[in-house]
Amino acid sequence: MNKFDIENLDLFYGENQALKSINLPIPVRQVTALIGPSGCGKSTLLRCLNRMNDLIEGVKITGKLAMDGEDIYGNIDVADLRIKVGMVFQKPNPFPMSIYENVAYGLRAQGIKDKKTIDEVVERSLRGAALWDEVKDRLKSHAFGLSGGQQQRLCIARTIAMEPDVILMDEPTSALDPIATHKIEELMEELKKNYTIVIVTHSMQQARRISDRTAFFLMGELVEHNDTQVIFSNPQDDRTQGYVNGDFG
């Protein structure tokens, strides 16, 4: 069963075509990794999934991108889409407020005022991000006092507090040390039990470790997608073979 179905998707920045006839199913409650060299289109595609590219002037998109069978570029509420499809960015970006308020912020923005409800969601979200035990005694402390890895897990907690269906991750560990990276990767294994995860990564080793499916992009084209084990052990396209072998990057 697929969470997203992408069919003949083209994206232009003005006259420059950044994505070329992309056809890609993204299965539900699995980790799909998007890999390829810089500028290949993987982050551009990721941002199509919650319409973040709408914020860029001159963008034109054609083709079909459906979530649960509904065209997300049709007549839908984009704010609701971005709640259902949360996003975690490359650099941890906690809000300049307490740990507690970082997670509670989105709930308050939705009009939820009941303290007990907010307390429960904050704890559940921090537990879901494997952060609760590390911060439960300092929830009122400023989020900037956390380590980089903790800040990134706080951003994940902030995302899952909104009860999304999908979590997009754009190189979520590239700014983290190996220990923090390992914790995020362990967390993703747990998160996929409840969420569909799509991750952009420059690390082929990471894609191999954490993903169920992998899609390889090159110069705006989707070269190949398959089970991750197949992509890395028996790719069908010579360009994929060259990339996973490290012949270019």
UniProtKB/Swiss-Prot annotation:
Q: Which domain of life is it from?
A: Bacteria
Q: Name one GO cellular component term.
A: plasma membrane
Major location, coarse class? membrane
Q: Name one GO biological process term.
A: phosphate ion transmembrane transport
Q: Where is the signal peptide?
A: none
Q: List the InterPro entries hit by this protein, alphabetically.
A: AAA+_ATPase, ABC_transporter-like_ATP-bd, ABC_transporter-like_CS, P-loop_NTPase, PstB-like
Disulphide-bonded residues: none
Q: Does the keyword Nucleotide-binding apply?
A: yes
According to its UniProt record, where is this protein located? Cell inner membrane
UniProt keyword annotations, A-Z: ATP-binding, Cell inner membrane, Cell membrane, Membrane, Nucleotide-binding, Phosphate transport, Translocase, Transport
CDD domains in the record: ABC_PstB_phosphate_transporter
Question: What is known about its subunit structure?
Answer: The complex is composed of two ATP-binding proteins (PstB), two transmembrane proteins (PstC and PstA) and a solute-binding protein (PstS).
- What family is reported? Belongs to the ABC transporter superfamily. Phosphate importer (TC 3.A.1.7) family.
Protein name (Swiss-Prot/TrEMBL): Phosphate import ATP-binding protein PstB 2
What are the leading ranks of the lineage?
Bacteria, Pseudomonadati, Pseudomonadota, Gammaproteobacteria, Vibrionales
